[in-house]
Amino acid sequence: MFFAIKGDNFDGNEFVEEALNKGAKYAIVDSDSVNIDNSKILRVKDSLGTLQKLATFHRTKTNSIVIALTGSNGKTTTKELIDCVLSSNFKTISTKGNYNNHIGVPLSLLQIEDDTEYSVIELGANNFGEIDFLTKITLPDYGYITNFGKAHLEGFIDIEGVIKAKTELYNWIIENNKTLILNFDDKQQKKFRNHKNISFTSEDDGDYKFELISGKKISVKNRDIKYHSNIYGDYNYSNICAAITIGLHFGIDSIKIQDALNSYELQNNRSQVLNMNGKEIILDAYNANPT
């Protein structure tokens, strides 16, 4: 199905005939400029809005448990870690790359199949109200915020604005009696501890307690079990802890979680490790936000 969506540079309505010729079964259009007499064309007021509504409708017809996450940074890495852990035991889908906006989120939800057990959906934003909007499309069962940092301040103004915007996810979760995933080491997240949640921490007051063993290639310990990864940087500590917490919460054996973390390697310029002439080079050029 081809959705004729208007963008900043192109209008999808101009490519309807080409899409049908290349095999699209139907085309959703919202412009009178499409003068093709074809039973495969469905005319609507808003192609993008139709895509979003279709994605939400599709999500309600599945039995998949949906986990939504947002944050100033670490979203994509955490999403991939959670996906890696859950996939070790369940049929899981997740957002491809960083398809985390008003178009990418619906496309991600439409990946869910009848036998998909878990779906990990990344939500991104650079203005107030966007996380709330995407959350209402996604209808998650669980919500997690990686962190709050000084990113997208052109829209959020300051750190208080970032917190207000990102916690739109938590507010929806609370209002709909779903489950928060909280990092108690983050004082902002800990404020939500009186609501339905699963939590992790370096202290003694969370559901899952972790200890950082190594900050070069991140290794952590929960109870007497050690989890090793191929990920560099102690800034990834909470990302790994979140993935382990979710895996343990859903009953995945610790050995499977260990194997999943051992197999995961970062790509696409995100703390990516390159071996050149016997030297290890860490390529971390993807993100330019100052957090």
Question: Regions from the language model: what does each represent?
Answer:
Residues 29-38, 144-280:
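Acidic, Mg2+-coordinating active-site environments of NTP-dependent enzymes
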Residues 10-13, 102-103, 128, 156, ...:
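Loop/helix-junction capping segments adjacent to catalytic residues or to phosphate/diphosphate-binding pockets
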Residues 23, 139, 265:
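Conserved functional loop/turn residues at catalytic and ligand-binding sites
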Residues 45, 96, 200-204:
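Residues at the C-termini of beta-strands that transition into short coil/loop
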Residues 269, 287-291:
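Glycine-rich phosphate/pyrophosphate-binding beta-alpha loops
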Residues 48-184, 188-196, 241, 247-248:
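Phosphate-binding loop of NTP-binding sites
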Residues 1-53, 232, 252:
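N-terminal leader/targeting and accessory segments in enzymes
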